[in-house]
Amino acid sequence: TFPLFTDLERELAKFKNTEKALVFNTGYMANVGTISAIADKNTIIFSDALNHASIIDGCGLSRGSVKAYNHCDVDELKYLLKEVDRNTRKLIVTDGVFSMDGDIAPLDKLYELSREYNALLMVDDAHATGTIGSGHGTAAYYGLEKEVDIQLGTLSKSLGSVGGYVAANSVIIDYLVN
């Protein structure tokens, strides 16, 4: 790895308040690559119905099964989670700010459900970084930087560059690298 990439990943991890970050060539590839790597055939992915196309494509390319819940409907998500065995691998994935209407995901409630039902929580902050709260994204907006398992984003919107990234703990980032 080039030192420049290592420096960028370190700064992104600091920016998102996570242990590590990993850069991708685009935000689209960050979503597709992360979801398809994490979700195996034994994983159920719970995806907001209005998630970005890159999330939908990542879910489709993964080997996991997908259950879409109505937009920002935490009650429906809870109902769907209740139907699944607690020991089944689960991934809840959402946009932080939805690009088509500007809604902010109820990340605080999604976090509570992720812990109650033993699920990983992933948020795509492509449209949240630089636009809400301190500019650090949805997890920071809700004060959940250390709690959200996976934060993704792009460098091509408010950060004015190219590329994408995933920020998470060392175990998740090392898994994605290997």
Residue ranges and their predicted role:
Residues N118, T138-S156:
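Conserved active-site segment immediately N-terminal to the catalytic lysine
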Residues E9-G33:
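Short loop-beta-helix segment that forms the pyridoxal 5′-phosphate
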Residues T1-T6:
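A glycine-/small-polar-enriched, mobile loop at the entrance of the PLP active site in fold-type I
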Residues T34-A53:
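Conserved PLP-anchoring active-site segment centered on the Schiff-base-forming lysine
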Residues K41, L61-R63, E147:
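Short, structured coil segments at secondary-structure junctions
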Residues K67, H71-V123:
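Active-site phosphate-binding strand-loop segment of PLP-dependent enzymes
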Residues I150-L152, V162-N178:
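Conserved core segment of the aminotransferase class I/II
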